[in-house]
């Protein structure tokens, strides 16, 4: 088991905690992380893009002029894709981009993402993240004391004061343990876990 320092919001060490090797000490495979991140991004796509084909464009279906004898190139109706304002050929239409990778792969990727943060010394554990009041300045000072600029902060539950204080700070995201995912772990430079969140993560992944 890896030992990690537990600090307070002032960056001072208060204790140590053991992290399970089955979650925070697994071999990191880039291909697995890539597979899950691509899935997450695909699932976030709205899929609402839509263009008009020649049957959707408003206009007459009358042939513009006769087929032969004019000396000009042959043309159909005004909605033809070769004309300005005509329909689009094989254009995008609303569709669902979401898909799933196996549950075991998603679970393994989450363990790998957590392990990568520990291996890079980018994982910090904080004993208590509860702020007495909503104050962005106080939050920014706490981040500076911990030596962190960008971070994903994972709380045990809803920390309203913390969420509102961090809302306007660039490069910081606060989320409860239930929302923990591979993409957000990898996106932010550091991972800050509430001490109570570790128990929830171990309960979810062990």
UniProtKB/Swiss-Prot annotation:
Alphabetical GO CC annotations of the entry are: ribonucleoprotein complex; ribosome
Q: Which GO terms describe its molecular function?
A: rRNA binding; structural constituent of ribosome
The entry's keywords: Ribonucleoprotein, Ribosomal protein, RNA-binding, rRNA-binding
- Pfam families in UniProt: Ribosomal_L4
The UniProt entry's sequence similarity note says: Belongs to the universal ribosomal protein uL4 family.
Matching entries from HAMAP family are given as: Ribosomal_uL4_B
Q: Record's NCBIfam families? A: rplD_bact (TIGR03953)
Q: What is the name attached to this protein's record?
A: Large ribosomal subunit protein uL4
């Amino acid at each position: 088991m890896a030992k990690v320092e537990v600090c307070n919001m002032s960056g001072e060490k208060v204790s140590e905690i053991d992290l399970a090797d089955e979650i925070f000490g697994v071999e990191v495979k880039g291909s697995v992380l890539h597979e899950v991140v691509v899935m997450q991004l695909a699932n976030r796509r709205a899929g609402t893009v839509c263009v008009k084909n020649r049957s959707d464009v408003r206009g007459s279906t009358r042939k513009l002029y006769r087929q032969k004898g004019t000396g000009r190139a042959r043309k159909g109706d005004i909605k033809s894709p070769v004309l300005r304002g005509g329909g689009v050929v094989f254009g995008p239409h609303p569709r669902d981009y979401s898909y799933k990778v196996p549950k075991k792969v998603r679970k393994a990727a989450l363990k790998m993402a957590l392990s990568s943060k520990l291996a890079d010394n980018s994982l910090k554990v904080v004993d208590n993240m509860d702020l007495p009041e909503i104050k962005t300045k106080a939050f920014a000072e706490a981040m500076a004391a911990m030596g962190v600029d960008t971070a994903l902060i994972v709380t045990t539950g809803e920390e309203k004061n913390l969420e509102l204080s961090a809302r306007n700070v660039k490069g910081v995201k606060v989320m409860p343990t239930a929302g923990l995912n591979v993409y957000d772990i990898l996106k932010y430079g550091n991972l800050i876990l509430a001490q109570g969140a570790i128990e929830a993560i171990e309960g979810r992944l062990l």
